[in-house]
């Protein structure tokens, strides 16, 4: 077992995820003479790929303009702008198609393999790595890294019960949010933005949404502090989820972490409707003679609000008919619809895409090659960097892009 680990390697890649594999394949294809090794601490490579997108793998997003693409990244967008001019979603699509995997675009522009199976993506990455001569070792954890006086790095790797030595000319760190590796990177002189969760759901306990799990509203506007996000929202057993919530959690990741995941939340159930416009519509419903004797609770004034939700938002009115609603009640209802006040009591996990914000300070990385500006021959790719996107394939895209650039840098540098 220890024979391979004491061998001198040209390239060692810590992390067997999407960025690590993409870098390894790119590097080995550009320079087949290089000895490339991937170290993966778990018992399976590409685990995140396999569980993402509900097992379908949201490979990327059909956004092919780098200037627009960077707007989907709460952190790291500006650093990625130049990187996306060299490898962007269109290049990702072409890469997978060239290697035998076709992608499809869904209505919301998320892109998946036509097989609807994440295993398709994991299998092609494993196959291409093996085909390019990349060696992969699982259950191998990077324990220590030292810069060698003669160039390159001396590593200590734990595999099984042993800690074994390894030497490499270049090292790529692609270990995501792994805390042990963060400490190693710090020991080499890099600064780290401490990671906190991003892309999570909100725990909310409120009688207005009790028993409504599964009810979706097509377009709401959410406000928290100075942040605003709009889009679909889903009521769950534990609170609120859906694209609008996930985007707000991403942009507000640090704010919510500082608040211990407790905050006030304003919900406009009508999207961009203002109070005055809402009052006018409610008044028309009151004045319309056919409505006068209909109960407010069963006759929604807005088609975009599901009837079950409408009933609970109007509970304070009781069983009144539209013709009997008072001006005060009408104003209170308008305020409830356009600026409902809720309390976030904690965070839930978005199982399809676990993401953190934070990581290696981007000013310390050359985004043309992904090489460290602090330590020669040290490279970074993927979520170990202080980059995170909203849900929709953007986090995988930053992994493909930084992995591809790192692979090019490792092969040519």
Description of each model-found segment:
Residues 4-19:
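Beta1/beta-strand and adjacent pyrophosphate-binding region of the FAD-binding site
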Residues 12, 28-54:
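Glycine-rich FAD pyrophosphate-binding loop
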Residues 12-14, 39, 142, 165-178, ...:
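Short hydrophobic core segments
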Residues 29, 44, 65-68, 85, ...:
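Residue-level recognition of phosphate/Mg2+-coordinating polar/acidic sites
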Residues 80-88, 107-127, 137, 174-176, ...:
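Short beta-strand to alpha-helix junction loop
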Residues 138-152:
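A conserved short coil-to-beta-strand element within the FAD-binding core of flavoproteins
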Residues 170, 174-188, 387-413:
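A conserved FAD-binding loop/helix module that cradles the flavin
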């Amino acid at each position: 077992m220890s024979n391979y680990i004491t061998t001198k390697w040209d390239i060692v890649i810590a992390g067997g995820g999407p960025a690590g594999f993409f870098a390894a394949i790119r590097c080995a294809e550009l320079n087949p003479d290089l000895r490339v090794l991937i170290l993966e601490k778990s018992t399976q490579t590409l685990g995140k790929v396999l569980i993402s997108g509900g097992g379908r793998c949201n490979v990327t997003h059909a956004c092919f303009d780098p200037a627009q693409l960077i707007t989907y990244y709460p952190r790291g967008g500006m650093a990625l702008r130049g990187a996306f001019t060299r490898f962007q979603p269109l290049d990702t699509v072409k890469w997978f198609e060239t290697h035998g995997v076709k992608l499809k675009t869904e209505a919301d522009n998320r892109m998946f393999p036509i097989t609807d199976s994440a295993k398709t993506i994991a299998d092609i990455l494993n196959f291409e790595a093996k085909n390019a001569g990349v060696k992969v070792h699982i259950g191998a954890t990077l324990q220590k890294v030292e810069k060698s006086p003669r160039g390159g790095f001396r590593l200590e790797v734990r595999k099984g019960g042993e800690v074994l030595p390894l030497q490499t000319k270049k090292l790529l760190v692609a270990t995501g949010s792994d805390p042990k590796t963060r400490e190693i990177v710090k020991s080499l002189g890099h600064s780290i933005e401490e990671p906190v969760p991003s892309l999570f759901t909100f725990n909310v306990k409120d009688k207005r949404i009790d028993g409504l799990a599964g009810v979706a509203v097509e377009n709401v506007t959410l406000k928290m502090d100075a942040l605003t996000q709009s889009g679909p929202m889903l009521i769950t057993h534990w609170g609120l989820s859906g694209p609008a919530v996930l985007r707000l959690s991403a942009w507000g990741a640090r704010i919510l972490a500082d608040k211990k995941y407790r905050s006030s939340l304003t919900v406009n159930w009508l999207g961009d409707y203002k109070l005055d416009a809402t009052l006018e519509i409610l008044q028309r419903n009151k004045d319309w003679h056919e409505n006068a004797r209909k109960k407010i609770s069963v006759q929604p004034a807005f088609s975009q609000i599901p009837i079950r939700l409408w009933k609970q938002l109007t509970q304070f009115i009781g069983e009144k008919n539209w013709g009997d609603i008072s001006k005060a009640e009408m104003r209170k209802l308008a305020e409830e619809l356009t600026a409902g006040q809720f309390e976030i009591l904690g965070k839930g996990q978005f199982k399809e895409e676990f993401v953190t914000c934070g990581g290696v300070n981007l000013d310390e990385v050359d985004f043309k090659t992904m090489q460290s500006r602090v330590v020669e021959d040290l490279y970074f790719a993927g979520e170990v960097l202080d980059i995170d996107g909203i849900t929709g394939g953007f986090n995988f895209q930053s992994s493909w892009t930084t992995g591809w650039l790192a692979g090019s840098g490792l092969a040519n540098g």
